[in-house]
Amino acid sequence: GQVGAQPEWFYKGDGSIVVAPETAISVPAFAEDAGEEPELVGLYLNDANGQPHRIGYAVGNEFSDHITERANYLWLAHSKLRACSYGPELLIGELPQHLEGTSRITREGQTLWEKPFLTGEANMAHSLANLEHHHFKYAQFRAPGDLHVHFFGTATLSFADQIKVQEGDRFEIELPAFGRALRNPVAFESHDNQAEQPSAMAVL
């Protein structure tokens, strides 16, 4: 019943970085890594008065650049600015306290890597109520009509097992309690010296 310590959290991006299930997750040319992050997702909609309402939950792939993250802990925020995906199912009502799922990468139809993961409040460092409080206490996150997608974290990464994702690999994240798995291929943007060239800036 009391407010707990505030959690660490990072801004992922606006709605333009979300890709639909079965759609390719794009990796920018300047990226150092392309790593899945199998997570539970909470979806929230602010009403006309700015009051957040939890719509439900989904399976998510937060997707991050773990090489950039490890190079400098201050770059963790940078590493999160990547595409992501969630769905295809929406779980409404009470969330089971304990959830067991499987994260998998396939290559040319064969399983390259597979590992179980745990989620649900029984496996989280913070309660959902505490996470929600510390996010929506900021007025800018309570703008009427805004939709918020919260990725609640993971401890299971193929990167930790030295897996290097390649063009055309497919991520599959399953939580049986949610129904169908979330699946996305990965696509790398062209390396046409984009990473070495400064961004063109127009002058007003």
Locations of regions flagged by a protein language model:
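Catalytic-pocket segment enriched in acidic/His residues
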Residues: 60, 64-204
